[in-house]
UniProtKB/Swiss-Prot annotation:
<dbReference type="InterPro" id="IPR003774">
    <property type="entry name" value="AlgH-like"/>
</dbReference>
<comment type="similarity">
    <text>Belongs to the UPF0301 (AlgH) family.</text>
</comment>
<protein>
    <recommendedName>
        <fullName>UPF0301 protein IL2218</fullName>
    </recommendedName>
</protein>
<dbReference type="Pfam" id="PF02622">
    <property type="entry name" value="DUF179"/>
</dbReference>
<dbReference type="GO" id="GO:0005829">
    <property type="term" value="C:cytosol"/>
</dbReference>
Length: 185
């Protein structure tokens, strides 16, 4: 099995599940036990500053770095936060995914947001998407998802409303030309 860790899953037009329709999901873990990822293009109705307020974390006023939205990372564990950011060694609970991407789950990164210790770019998600053993592979076989290597430019510098389209452009073909039977000989 080839791991899709540090890849982006792109929902194909055939995927009509309202939770995942037109989503781009960053895969944090993929092995024989299953997969776990974070949806990166569904802003929640919650700003970063509102979340910090709810957690009683003090932050500098009028900081542009904190004006963005929190993202709906997926339907599982919606009270759990994940921060995707460029690698830094400052945090208690981090996993380096590549030379360009790290995922942190500890509160200390939230406490640093808006300060000079904060990562220069970040996506903050609540919840995650999870797949049981073999489930993601089955969905890939059904043409529900396509995968590309993770792209920091797409993660950190592309507006969320454009991430699905930009990701599909990296596939090298028109995703709208896919049929439900592609790959099934």
């Amino acid at each position: 099995m080839n791991s899709l860790q540090n890849h982006l899953l792109i929902a194909t037009p055939m995927l009509n599940d309202p939770m995942f329709k037109r989503t781009v999901t960053y895969i944090c873990e993929h092995n024989e036990e299953g997969a776990m990822g974070l949806v990166i293009n569904q802003p929640a109705d919650l700003s970063v500053t509102s979340l910090l307020d709810k957690l009683e974390i003090v932050y500098p006023e009028n900081n542009q770095h904190l004006q963005g939205s929190v993202y709906q990372g997926g339907p599982v564990g919606r009270e759990r936060g994940f921060v995707i950011h460029p690698p830094q060694d400052n945090w208690r609970a981090s996993q380096k995914m590549s030379d360009d991407i790290m995922v942190t789950t500890s509160r200390d990164i939230l406490e640093a947001l808006g300060s000079s210790a904060a990562p220069p770019q970040f996506l903050l998600t609540l919840g995650y998407a999870g797949w049981e053993a073999g489930q993601l592979e089955e969905e890939l076989g059904e043409n529900s998802w396509l995968a590309i290597p993770a792209d920091p430019e797409l993660l950190f510098n592309t507006p969320p409303s454009e991430r699905w389209q930009k990701a599909t452009e990296q596939l090298g073909f028109d995703v709208w030309q896919l049929g439900p039977d592609v790959g099934h000989a």
